[in-house]
Amino acid sequence: EELTHYGRVSDKRRLFSGSTARTRVKSDQFYITHQTPKGHMAIYEGRPYTDWDKNKELGIDVPVISHESGQRCIYPNFKEIPNFTGPVQARNFEVFRESLAANGMLDQADDFFRVSGAQTVLEYKDVIEAELRTSLKSGFQLLALNDFTGQGYAPVGILDPFWESKGLITPEKFREFCAPTVALLRFPKRAYYCDETFEGKAEVYNYSPSILKSAKAKWWITDASGRVLKSGRLKTQRIGNYGVFPLGTFQYMLNSVTAPQKLTIHLSVGDKVHNSWDIWVYPHHKDLMQTTPDVLYTTTYDAKAKQYLQEGKKVVLCPKPNKVKGRKSVFHNHFWNPIMFKWAPTTLGCLIHADQPMFADFITEKHLDWQWWDILTN
């Protein structure tokens, strides 16, 4: 408090704060933190929908900056090992490599790096967009864009320790969701049935030096081949700067979908601002998971299930999550590293063999995306 007060009275050119992510003092002119007296406002992970923000945790008497956003781990890239040519050697990477080799999986090392990296990029997009939607927040921090080599090593960057790209995302794609002006879209979920209607609430984050005098906002929806299924325009309007501004709402009926599909929702503001989001649409088989004389769907292995099997019939057993013994699965990659934050399950996503027949009606990439949320969470 004494140092902050001294700074304020001695130098009017700067703003002063007593700490980062620790105790707030009375003389603070801004506050960098994980939480305020109104609640936890830092954002470390995305959600399976985008219609949310952290405004209710804000609105205190000084500007608030969110501390250390995102920071989800990526599997080590063993190709970086030769780059450590000085007194610091990548012994930790060598330990991981030896462990993988001992378990007969060294040939999958690059796949593990790629799929975990793709998921971390996915998380950064959603985390940063949530930060931008939070209009009462004065900013956010990433610890860095590159990996942090201290504290046991935190491979959370989209750049490696040498500030080289990991090849996970291009600068142009990153700036679609992290730039002075960003198109944003609020919607309630990412997985739909074909008898539902998608509704998006468009916004624009504009902290550029200039107002947008005649902002022309367009939206369009494409399928996996890039074919445009529907498009439209929102009202042309004057958009201010230093804020988050509503653009309008649009809808799209999904009843034209007859087979499982991934669709991409696009939103542009003017000629230079563009962003996009994926959703997954499925036919609504209302008779699915219904017991018949030949097939029993059940959550418990009971006398009825045994009887079905004894009679040569089929049983589909789907135990409730709280009844299954084993490690709980999660969607998110581990935070920072398990040396500093040792909580279960310390996993880094999934390597999915997407070409297998079991995924014929479940559209997926090799890495996790938001259509997996419910499966892994429940």
For the regions a protein language model found, what residue spans apply to each?
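Short, exposed coil/turn segments at beta-strand boundaries within extracellular/luminal domains
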Residues: G270-S276
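Beta-strand-rich binding/interaction modules
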Residues: E196-T236, L247-M253, P260-G270
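A glycine-rich, often tryptophan-bearing local segment used as a flexible ligand/cofactor-contacting loop or short
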Residues: Y301-T377
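Aromatic-rich peripheral "rim/lid" segments of glycoside hydrolase catalytic domains that contact
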Residues: L143-S208
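Low-complexity, Pro/Ser/Thr- and charge-rich linker/hinge segments at domain boundaries
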Residues: W280-T300
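Histidine-centered catalytic/metal-binding microenvironments
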Residues: S135-S138, L143-W163, E172, S214-W219, ...
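Outer-membrane beta-barrel proteins
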Residues: S116, P188-R190, Y207, G240, ...
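Substrate-binding/catalytic cleft of secreted carbohydrate-active enzymes
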Residues: E1-L159
